[in-house]
Amino acid sequence: MKIKLEQLEIFMTLDKKESQVINARKQIANLIYSQGAGFGLAGQALAVKMWNGDDEIDYSSEEASIIRSVVEKTTAPCFIEAVNKAIETGTNA
């Protein structure tokens, strides 16, 4: 599955009138690496894969689950919503 994290639209207000588009891939890689306790070497491998990759990376369902879990535990609701949408709309290659 491809998850588009390099052009992630994050809505800054509840009415969704203000947003920012950011490259979140490396930011999420750092979160997994520094705060992904419990994922062990799989988390480390995913963080390295994300850091060195691009929007064309294929993620397994297990990797998507790690991304979702770490983001939900460590970031703001607006960021969580954006990442969950990217995962849900990911494409199978």
Where are these regions (language model features)?
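Positively charged, low-complexity terminal tracts
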Residues: 1-93
